Structures are given as C-alpha cells and as structure tokens.
UniProtKB/Swiss-Prot annotation:
It is an enzyme of class 1 (oxidoreductase). GO terms for molecular function: alkanesulfonate monooxygenase activity; uracil oxygenase activity. Its EC number is 1.14.99.46. Induction: Up-regulated by the nitrogen regulatory protein C (NtrC also called GlnG) and repressed by RutR. Keywords: Flavoprotein, FMN, Monooxygenase, NADP, Oxidoreductase. It comes from Shigella dysenteriae serotype 1 (strain Sd197). It catalyses: uracil + FMNH2 + NADH + O2 = (Z)-3-ureidoacrylate + FMN + NAD(+) + H2O + H(+); thymine + FMNH2 + NADH + O2 = (Z)-2-methylureidoacrylate + FMN + NAD(+) + H2O + H(+). One of its GO terms (biological process) is uracil catabolic process. The gene is rutA. Belongs to the NtaA/SnaA/DszA monooxygenase family. RutA subfamily. This is Pyrimidine monooxygenase RutA. It holds the Pfam family Bac_luciferase. FMN binds at I68, K69, N134, E143, R159, Y160, S209. The FMN-N(5)-oxide reacts spontaneously with NADH to produce FMN. Requires the flavin reductase RutF to regenerate FMN in vivo.
Length: 382
C-alpha cells in the first residue's frame, strides 16, 4: 500500500519559492543513515565524499554538511563505528570544489573555541569564503567518556549555557581577531586569531528543544530540524513555526533547513519495495544502543533530536523524514516542503549517495517548481 502524497497545505509567491536551498548530508560515517544490512554497506573515505560533493556541485546543490561522530552504535552493521573527522574532511573537499558551500561540525566539548576559530579561518582561505561551522553540544555520553572529557550529567541541562559562551568567543575572534571573554566555562586573556575569515562566518545549529531553538534564535544563521514521517513532507511545519517564533523574540531572521532521506525509483511501487527491504533488515542491536543512549538525558525535555532519532516508528534511518516514491512523486513532495513558511532549505541523504544524487539531478530536480530557476545541465560530472 503506497502512502498518499498529501495536498499542499501552504502556498508561497513564485519569487519566494525560488529561495529554497538544497544540501547534501555527506556520509562521514559508514553506511550513511540506514541501520540495516539490506542497505548499501560501505566505509567512509575521502574519495567517496569527494565524488559525492563534486557530483552535488555539478547538479547545483547549494551546500554540503558533514556531522561529527566519535563512537558508533555497534551491532552487526557496526553502525557509525567508522568515521572520518569533520574539519579535515571538509578542508579537503573545499580544495576540490569551487562553488558549493561547505560546512563542518564542531563537537564543542572536544575543541577549544579559539582552535575552531582558527581552523575555520583556515578553511575559509582554502574555500575562498565558502565555509561555515555547525555547532553541536554532544548528547551521546560514551563519545566523551572514552576520552575522559565528559563533564558530568549536569551538562545535559547546561549544554546551551556552555554553547552560548563558546559562540561568543568565536564571534569575538572572527570579528575583531581578539577576545577577552570571561565566563563560567571559558576565560580568554588577550586571545588572538589572525588572519580572520574573508567573509562573515556562518554558524548553524540543529536545536529542536526549547533551549536549542532559543540558542539558534540568538546566535545561528539558520537551524536544522528533522523532517517527520514517511511521505508526510509538511509534518515538520510546527517545528519550523516554533523556530520562527523564537527568532521573532530576538528580532533576527533564522530560517529552518529540513533533513530528509530520498528513496526514489522509476515507480512508487519500486521505491516502496526498496524501503520495505531496508526496514526488514533493521539492525536491532545497533538500534537498541541508540534507544539506550537516548534515555540518558533526563533533563532536556521530550522534544530533543535524539528522542526523535530513537523513536521505534522508523528507527532504521533514525526517524528522519523519508520521501519514498517515483521521481515525480519525490519532486512533488519536495515542492510541498518548500511551501512551508520559513522553510529555507532541505538537507538530503540518500540510500545510495552517488546514484541518488545523479538521479536527483537528472530526474527529480528538473521537475521541482522550487528549483525551476536553475540552468539546464549540458554535461555530466565524471
């Protein structure tokens, strides 16, 4: 039984529709975002991610983002047990691309802000001003306990206080090249960073809790959130509304970028068959680890990203919104995503990244109203 594609709930003027950005969430960890031995199995390498991002650039994707993961979930698929490091990967990708925006993720418990400020300024130089930083507080305790740097479980309730000080130091150093910031977590004494970035450095976050959205409203340039459900492209809208309301309190414009997985094929039935096959092989041991870790934070409320990731409804792809269908169906659903007010962009993952980006560029994107402004491609990337 196919999921019906819902009718459009929102409408935007044509000129507003053209603003939607498309990004790729590169597979910095093994097997991407499908926790199943029935899905493609692969290790993360620079060459793989280089091919993915160069192909994305060819098809006019606007940005590429890598996460950071320091310990995986185990299981028979060894899910995310094998990971590259985000800043060094994205520095390499910045050097082999020319137009696409590049974002690395800082695990802020592991890197002092002054070091991140300098690394970001370096990649700004490599990329010619195409670099930005995604800041994460850290939710998976074993990632940090293994290195002896977990600050204690009180951190769950203070992590955005920590991140607030962190970003203030970053802004000082990127803005003036100097910081004398004094806080509960950081003390800067005539700290210097030079050269500074050539353009204002973009900071992004992925807060869905009230505290996370309040942080993004004050300090982020845009905020990532999860899509929800299977073939329910506008179900995330209440989250985008909450982000918009939080930003209104600070007088800033902070749009939402929505995370979706695309599983597409010639027909709805063929795409659905792939999705059901992936789900049938779900790695229960790895999923149990995710569920266990999601329960460690008892202080951040029920609306956090990790709570959604561990929901059993569609845990095989950590419950990101999933668009399953023919190329035309997926294009139509992505136009529905773009119709939601304050949804400024979409971050995509694929079951198979190389073929997925190619079919997106050749078969899906040309059907999308919100991408109709793009030039017609004449030559495929190697």
């Amino acid at each position: 039984m196919q999921d019906a594609v819902p009718r459009l709930t929102f409408t935007l003027r044509d000129e507003e529709r053209l603003m939607v950005k498309i990004g790729v969430f590169v597979p910095i960890g093994n097997n991407g975002w499908l926790i199943s031995p029935h899905a493609p199995q692969y290790m993360p390498t620079f060459e793989l991610n280089k091919a993915i991002v160069q192909k994305a650039e060819h098809y006019h994707f606007d940005f590429a983002l890598s996460m950071i993961k320091l310990r995986g979930f185990g299981g028979k698929t060894e899910f995310w047990d094998h990971n590259l490091e985000s800043f060094t990967l994205m520095a390499g990708l910045a050097a082999v691309t020319s137009r696409i925006q590049i974002y690395a993720t800082a695990a802020t418990l592991t890197l002092p802000p002054a070091i991140v400020a300098r690394m970001a300024a370096t990649i700004d130089s490599i990329s010619g001003g195409r670099f930005g930083v995604n800041l994460v507080t850290g939710w998976q305790k074993p990632e940090y306990e293994q290195m002896g740097i977990w600050p204690g479980d009180d951190y769950f309730s203070r992590r955005y206080d920590y991140l607030t000080e962190y970003v203030q130091v970053l802004r000082d150093l990127w803005g003036s090249g100097k910081s004398d910031f004094k806080g509960d977590f950081f003390t800067m004494n005539d700290c210097r960073v030079s050269p500074q970035p050539s353009v204002p450095m973009k900071v992004i976050c992925a807060g869905q809790s009230d505290a996370g959205m309040a942080f993004s409203a004050q300090y982020a340039d845009f905020n990532f959130c999860f899509g929800k459900g299977v073939n329910t492209p506008t179900a995330f809208a209440p989250t985008a509304v909450r982000m918009k309301q939080a930003a209104e309190q600070t007088g800033r414009d902070v749009g939402s970028y929505i995370l979706f997985m695309v599983i597409a094929d010639e027909t709805d039935d063929a795409a659905r068959a792939k999705w059901e096959h992936y789900k049938a092989g779900a790695d229960e041991e790895a999923l149990s680890w995710l569920t266990e870790q999601s329960q460690k934070d008892t202080r951040s409320g029920t609306d956090t990203n990790v709570r959604q990731m561990a929901d059993p409804t569609s845990a095989v792809n950590i419950n990101m919104g999933t668009l399953v269908g023919s190329y035309a169906s997926v294009a139509r659903m992505l136009d529905e995503v773009a119709s939601v007010p304050s949804a400024e962009g979409v971050l995509l993952t694929f079951d198979d990244f190389l073929s997925g980006i190619e079919t997106f560029g050749e078969r899906i994107q040309p059907l999308m109203q919100c991408r109709a402004h793009l030039p017609v491609l004449t030559q495929e990337v190697a």
